C-alpha cells in the first residue's frame, strides 16, 4: 500500500513539474512572432550595420532575455506598453554587447562611414581597424560614466557627435601619425 501511495505521489509531482514547465515555455511560433517584431528595429543605430547572421543572433538574445523575464507568453503579450518594453530590451542588449566587446563599436561607426567622413584612410587591414576601435572605445569609456550614457548620447545628443568625432580623430592621429585640425565655431548673439 505504501509503495502504491509513494508511486502515486512521485508520479503526480513529476507530471505537475512537466506540465508547469511546458506551460512556462514559449512555442517556436511565439518566438518567431517576436523575431519578426524585432525586424522593425533593424534601422536603429548599431543594428543597421549588422550582417544578417549577426542580427539573427542579436534578436535571438533579445527574445531569450524577454522569455526569461516573461516565461508565460500571454503575460508578455498583454503587457501595457509592450512596445516600450521590447525597446528597453533591445537597447539593453546593445549595451551588453558594447560592454562585452569594444570592437562592436564598428556597428555604430562602421569603417566605410569613417572613411567617407575623412576620419580613417581607405584600405586599412583588419588589425589596423581593430586598433582604431580599441583606442576609440578606451576614450569613450574614459569620457562617459557608463555604456548606457554613451549610447544615449549617440542616439539623442547632437553635441556629443562633435565630441565623438574629436575622439575618433585623436585615435586616427595617434595610430596613423595624422595631424588634427579642430575647427570650433562660436556663435555670439
Regions found by a protein language model. Name each.
Residues 47, 51-59, 91, 125-133, ...:
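Membrane-interface starts of transmembrane alpha-helices
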Residues 4-13:
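Sec-dependent N-terminal signal peptides
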Residues 72-94, 149-159, 163:
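Short, charged early-sequence alpha-helical segments and their helix-coil boundaries
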Residues 92-134, 141-144, 176-184:
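Extended amphipathic alpha-helical interaction segments
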Residues 38-73:
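Post-signal-peptide N-terminal segment of Sec-exported extracytoplasmic proteins
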Residues 147-189:
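C-terminal amphipathic alpha-helix
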Amino acid at each position: 500500500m505504501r509503495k502504491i501511495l509513494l508511486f502515486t505521489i512521485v508520479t503526480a509531482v513529476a507530471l505537475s513539474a512537466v506540465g508547469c514547465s511546458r506551460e512556462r515555455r514559449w512555442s517556436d511560433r511565439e518566438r518567431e512572432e517576436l523575431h519578426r517584431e524585432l525586424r522593425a528595429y533593424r534601422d536603429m543605430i548599431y543594428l543597421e550595420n549588422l550582417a544578417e547572421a549577426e542580427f539573427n543572433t542579436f534578436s535571438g538574445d533579445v527574445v531569450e532575455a524577454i522569455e526569461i523575464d516573461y516565461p508565460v507568453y500571454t503575460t508578455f503579450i498583454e503587457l501595457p506598453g509592450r512596445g516600450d518594453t521590447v525597446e528597453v530590451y533591445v537597447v539593453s542588449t546593445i549595451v551588453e554587447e558594447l560592454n562585452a566587446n569594444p570592437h562592436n563599436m564598428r556597428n555604430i561607426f562602421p569603417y566605410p562611414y569613417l572613411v567617407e567622413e575623412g576620419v580613417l584612410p581607405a584600405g586599412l587591414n583588419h588589425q589596423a581597424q581593430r586598433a582604431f576601435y580599441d583606442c576609440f572605445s578606451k576614450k569613450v569609456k574614459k569620457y562617459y560614466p557608463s555604456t548606457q550614457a554613451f549610447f544615449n548620447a549617440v542616439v539623442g545628443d547632437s553635441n556629443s557627435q562633435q565630441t565623438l568625432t574629436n575622439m575618433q580623430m585623436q585615435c586616427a592621429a595617434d595610430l596613423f601619425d595624422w595631424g588634427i585640425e579642430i575647427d570650433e565655431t562660436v556663435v555670439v548673439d
